[in-house]
Amino acid sequence: MMNILLINGPNLNLLGTREPEIYGNKTLIDIEKDLTKVAKEKSINIECFQSNHEGEIVDKIHDSVKSIQGILINAGAFTHTSISIRDALIGSKIPFVELHISNIFSREDFRKESFLTDKAIGIISGFGISSYFLALEGIIGYLNGKN
């Protein structure tokens, strides 16, 4: 069975209440349940992880090297600031898809810079909650050699 790690960064635990006009009304728990269900139907195991702390995300990536085949990451604000998460992803050699609920390229200038994009196998941005499901399809296709 293929094992995928879903990483959500800072403030994504507030989904459903934080700026619903941008991020929608679904909670992170709702998204994780729905994504896990879809993955299970495809014989994929998803491990969900969320942290507001950069070092915890780095540690999770390090701890996943031997058990995870692909990563889906919505790094939140760390997308624009974290060299340590970037380096952990590169060092892990685990293929990853960067994802965002909103279109980060149509927002404030500081959100247009990503420390992850050039190392990701792909980026999904701007499709709302569907970004998670599109990213899952992308990583599955990549890992199955359909890229």
UniProtKB/Swiss-Prot annotation:
Enzyme's top EC category: lyase
What Gene3D superfamilies does the record point to?
Dehydroquinase, class II
Name the EC number(s). 4.2.1.10
Q: Would you indicate the residue range of the signal peptide? A: none
Which is an annotated Pfam family here? DHquinase_II
Which BP terms does GO give this entry? amino acid biosynthetic process; aromatic amino acid family biosynthetic process; chorismate biosynthetic process; quinate catabolic process
Q: Which reaction does it catalyse?
A: 3-dehydroquinate = 3-dehydroshikimate + H2O
Which molecular function terms from Gene Ontology are attached? 3-dehydroquinate dehydratase activity
Keywords, in A-Z order: Amino-acid biosynthesis, Aromatic amino acid biosynthesis, Lyase
Any idea which positions bind substrate?
74, 80, 87, 101-102, 111
The catalytic residues are: 23 (proton acceptor), 100 (proton donor)
User: Site annotation (Transition state stabilizer): which residues?
Assistant: 18
The record's annotation in InterPro entries points to: DHquinase_II, DHquinase_II_CS, DHquinase_II_sf
Task performed by this protein: Catalyzes a trans-dehydration via an enolate intermediate.
Q: Which family does it belong to?
A: Belongs to the type-II 3-dehydroquinase family.
Family matches, as PANTHER family = CATABOLIC 3-DEHYDROQUINASE
Assembly mode:
Homododecamer.
The name under which this protein is listed is 3-dehydroquinate dehydratase
Query: Could you read off the lineage of the organism from its UniProt record?
Result: Bacteria, Bacillati, Cyanobacteriota, Cyanophyceae, Synechococcales
Gene name of the encoded protein: aroQ
